[in-house]
């Protein structure tokens, strides 16, 4: 039975009003659960929430809460039960319930996660397995949550930077479209009575305006169809994702941000795994795509550069070469390679990876700040150019009125 989300209002044993949400199979079950908590005068209202996929922030928060409960010496099973009782995300709640059922059937926590899959990477599952074996599950969960939070913060920062330019560019395109549809035709009527030859830019603008007026419905249909095609099909295709990454990699600043982000994430993930006691070969292998038990399709390669680099490193390491000698400049710059070499020689590779991540995180932040400072004036130039071209094209015949009158 599909679970449902209910909002409730009730009174606690001290007759204080309580508000919140609860997930249950039926309204009666939700009512019974609230009574078991000691609540009375219960009012329930179902929220028709769709079963949306949990966000990365929700997964990070869940792992953070699990780490806190485990650090408080609460057993794993009880911790998961507490998390499920307080989880108001339907899909995540059902996932926790299946995890509990798998653990009750005798599976280890890491095995249960791998069986259910979906929300944790292979690296994170291996870390949890090591945490179980070493008795440091709480520490491992905390590190995974912290790493996820850092990655999410970077992603949100980039989204925030891109939001304003995207809105400005969208408004400028709408304004340009409005000028071509409503203002330019008025100039066309003004110039239609003259037999003089119009400037090239004016003639082009009048032709574009006339084309838009005659085909605006068809164009809107194709634009809407393209966005629907992109959202529901194109963005899910591996080849499109890879081509998009290749295009970003050759774009100034964006390519640098992509490369630094790849280096920081790889260094942080590898450092966490090595510190947890995962062997280097096994840690590197976790970066390669693999089909898990819950998957019915072949796992897709999200980052071709990283996949190629890790395969190359594994090949050289398996032949006896040092890790620092196996990496290339596509992933680690020369400075970082020297730091890796020092880390290997001193037996502190994990610590050196942490230093590399911190060092290049600063460079990544600098590039993001630089992008933020460049985008605003760039948008102003684009807007000014669009409107300026239209205005110049429309008023150029007036400036050349002498020849037009003749």
Swiss-Prot record:
User: Which keywords label this protein?
Assistant: Cell inner membrane, Cell membrane, Membrane, Transmembrane, Transmembrane helix, Transport
Q: Where would you find the membrane-spanning parts of this chain? A: 167-187, 214-234, 379-399
According to its record, how does it sit in the membrane?
Multi-pass membrane protein
Which GO terms of type biological process are on file? Answer: protein secretion by the type II secretion system
Q: Which domain of life is it from?
A: Bacteria
Q: Name one Pfam family in it.
A: T2SSF
Q: Where in the cell is it found?
A: Cell inner membrane
Keyword Isomerase listed: no
Primary residence: membrane
Q: Which GO terms describe its cellular component?
A: plasma membrane
Q: Isomerase as a keyword?
A: no
Q: Which InterPro entries match?
A: GspF/PilC, T2SS_GspF/T4SS_PilC_CS, T2SS_GspF_dom, T2SS_GspF_sf
User: Which family does the record assign?
Assistant: Belongs to the GSP F family.
Tell me the protein's name.
Protein transport protein HofC homolog
The opening ranks of the lineage are:
Bacteria, Pseudomonadati, Pseudomonadota, Gammaproteobacteria, Pasteurellales
Please state the gene responsible for encoding this protein.
Answer: hofC
């Amino acid at each position: 039975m599909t679970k449902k989300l209910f909002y409730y209002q009730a009174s606690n044993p001290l007759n204080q009003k309580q508000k919140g949400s609860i997930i249950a199979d039926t309204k009666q079950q939700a009512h019974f659960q609230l009574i078991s908590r000691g609540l009375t005068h219960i009012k329930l209202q179902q929220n028709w929430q769709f079963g949306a996929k949990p966000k990365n922030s929700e997964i990070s928060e869940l792992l953070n809460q699990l780490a806190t409960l485990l650090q408080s010496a609460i057993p794993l099973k009880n911790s998961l039960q507490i998390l499920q009782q307080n989880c108001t995300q339907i899909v995540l709640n059902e996932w926790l319930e299946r995890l509990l059922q798998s653990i009750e059937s005798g599976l280890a926590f890491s095995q249960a996660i791998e069986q259910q899959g979906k929300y944790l990477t292979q690296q994170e599952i291996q870390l949890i397995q090591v945490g179980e074996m070493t008795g440091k599950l709480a520490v491992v969960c905390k590190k995974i949550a912290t790493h996820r939070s850092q990655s999410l913060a970077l992603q949100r920062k980039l989204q925030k930077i891109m939001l304003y330019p995207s809105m400005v560019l969208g408004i400028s395109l709408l304004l340009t479209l409005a000028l071509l549809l409503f203002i330019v035709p008025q100039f066309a009527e003004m110039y239609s009575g003259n037999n003089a030859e119009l400037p090239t830019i004016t003639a082009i603008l009048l032709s574009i305006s006339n084309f838009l007026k005659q085909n605006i419905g068809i164009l809107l249909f194709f634009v809407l169809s393209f966005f629907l095609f992109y959202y529901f099909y194109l963005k899910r295709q591996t080849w499109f994702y890879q081509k998009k990454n290749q295009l970003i990699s050759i774009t100034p600043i964006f390519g640098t941000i992509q490369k630094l982000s790849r280096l920081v994430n790889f260094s942080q993930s590898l450092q966490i795994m090595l510190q947890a006691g995962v062997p280097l070969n096994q840690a590197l292998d976790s970066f390669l795509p693999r089909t898990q038990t819950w998957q019915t399709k072949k796992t897709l390669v999200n980052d071709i550069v990283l996949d190629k680099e890790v395969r190359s490193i594994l090949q050289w390491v398996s032949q006896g070469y040092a890790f620092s000698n196996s990496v290339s400049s596509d992933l680690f710059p020369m400075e970082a390679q020297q730091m890796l070499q020092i880390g290997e020689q001193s037996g502190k590779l994990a610590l050196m990876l942490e230093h590399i991540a911190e060092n290049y995180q600063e460079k990544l932040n600098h590039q993001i700040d630089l992008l933020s400072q460049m985008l605003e004036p760039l948008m102003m130039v684009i807007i000014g150019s669009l409107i300026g071209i239209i205005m110049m094209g429309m008023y150029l015949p007036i400036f050349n009125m002498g020849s037009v009158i003749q």
